[in-house]
């Protein structure tokens, strides 16, 4: 077990998406919350945990997103030229991860209320349980619109299914994907 799991951690922040559900021409992560771009709140927590080992994946309005990020921290960037999903965005960031990294945390750039303590707790649990992958999920009374977390009889994650692709049975699942992984 790693003595200090925070020592060799990198964080990837996904900020390349179009944010089409917001019905705005502005990149979703640039919308202001409490006078700052949404992504700046995520960066505060990420940098508190990983220092300068933070990689922001940019795409839509990349230059504006980079500008907003650099106003408040020293981070690296990876460009996702085509928005081809979360997995592809992570692949775009992988070359920027330092070789000394032992754990990678993946965050969405649109979770401004995420606290550094939550990230640390997720990582500590991930390391303690010696998992290959940890997904932060939440149970909602009304999960409409969210990706469902499908778990087998052994309590293992089998897949994440988006609402549009879910069967009626899967739509009844109340555990949803937060988009936060380790």
List the model feature ranges, each with a label.
Residues 1-9, 37-108, 112-124:
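Conserved N-terminal catalytic core of the sugar/cofactor nucleotidyltransferase
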Residues 2-6, 23, 48, 96-99, ...:
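Solvent-exposed alpha-helices and their adjacent loops that cap or buttress functional pockets
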Residues 9-33, 49:
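Glycine-rich N-terminal loop/short-helix segment of MobA-like nucleotidyltransferase
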Residues 15, 58, 108, 137-138:
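Short beta-strand/turn micro-motifs composed of small residues
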Residues 17, 110, 152:
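Acidic active-site catalytic centers that drive phospho-/nucleotidyl reactions
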Residues 30, 77, 133-135:
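Conserved beta-strand scaffold positions in the cores of enzyme catalytic domains, especially
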Residues 33, 78, 160:
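Hydrophobic residues at beta-strand termini and immediately following loops
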Residues 63, 73, 114-182:
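Conserved core of the sugar-phosphate nucleotidyltransferase
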